Amino acid sequence: MNKKLFEVYLVLLIILSTPLYAKSPIKVACIGNSITFGTGTENPQTESYPAQLQQLLGHNYIVGNFGKPGATLLKRGHRPYTLQPEYQKAMNFAGDIAVIHLGINDTDPRDWPNYR
């Protein structure tokens, strides 16, 4: 099984294993960079992966999109996610489940000046 397909199955397994009999909707916080935000799609509001996840999960879930284009996982990166407004919004959302997709922008040479 390729890695991407495994990741999708893992996320769905975690989300779907949450009890469906909960009294209030289960909140899923999608935290990440431009991929989470939906950059490159015609309409991130409907075509980003968090929007697609909301459609798949239905009304028993509330999926929040807290993607920030260019965000890094590194605290000393060129755009640390924890210093972005989306981070605080994600914390205030207080999701029951978090899907984190960060790290792509951490390969930026600005964040590794001593690497040769």
Give the label of every model feature segment.
Residues M1-Y9:
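Bacterial N-terminal signal peptides that target proteins for export
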Residues V8-S17:
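Bacterial N-terminal signal peptides
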Residues S17-T18, S48:
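A short hydrophobic/aromatic micro-motif that marks alpha-helical segments and, especially, helix-coil
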Residues L20-S24:
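Boundary at the C-terminal end of the N-terminal hydrophobic targeting segment
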